[in-house]
Amino acid sequence: LPCFKCKSCREGNYATCENYDYYGSRRDGGMTEYIAVKRWNLVKMPSGLSYDEGAMCEPVSVARHAVGKLNISKGESVFISGAGPIGLIAGQWAVLLGAKKVYYTDIDKRKLEFAKTLGFYEWENGTVTDCALEGTGYSNALQKCLETVKPHGRMVLMGNPAGEVTMSQNTYWQILRKELCINGTWNSSYNDVINDWHESIKAMADGELNVKPLITHKFPLSECNTAFKMMKNKTEFYNKVILNMQGAD
């Protein structure tokens, strides 16, 4: 919900709006069965695309926006810290854009095993990559990215930190001595020229991007508290949890 008035909005960069709002985050309504929104906020789902896939459009768009900033060339290798839903979707986008291998690190070994079932690789000590995507917002993950990427490599910071992020002198040196190019990323692009949402819907509809394996759990809305409790207490492994307004399949 951009303001359409600030400099960023006038340039079509709505994600960096100075006054933007958000359904389900800054504004209530994102988890209601029905919500009235302006037509501008809608993305038409093509026939053949399931509601589950449609529900994944937002993380797919965020991942596309981030990976696009890596400027991946055919045959390059990519390192991603964080094997959560957006991180794994980012890996798929990286492959679509030409990456030969995508490596992951994560503190949860189950996530790494899950990533390997999707055709990705667990990062091993000493592996150097052409570019890196930081997807956790933690200091040690940032350091690992800087250590892993090659000299003159590219790096994108995507992880939203829950606390302070610190950097040691040695970590800072990695940026200087490798002459790294580092970009930030926030949300997605959705203007008339670049629209990550439209491209994401198209990629899923065309079968280029498969998000179905990432959906590990589905709950009816009436059991949302059960879903939240499972996620909070981590009583079982999950990747992406869907609340189905029509009842879980």
Predicted regions and their residues:
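Glycine-rich cofactor phosphate-binding loops and adjacent beta1-alpha1 units
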Residues: L70, L112-L180
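C-terminal substrate-binding/catalytic core of Rossmann-like NAD(P)-dependent dehydrogenases/reductases
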Residues: V165-I215, N225-T226
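C-terminal capping/lid region of NAD(P)-dependent oxidoreductase domains
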Residues: V156-V165, L180, D206-H217, N225-D249
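Mid-domain Rossmann-like dinucleotide-binding core that forms the NAD(H)/NADP(H) cofactor-binding site
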Residues: L49-N125
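Short acidic-hydrophobic, aromatic-tinged amphipathic segments that line or gate anion-handling sites
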Residues: Y121-N125, K218-E223
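NAD(P)H dinucleotide-binding glycine-rich loop of Rossmann-like/cofactor-binding domains
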Residues: C3-S81
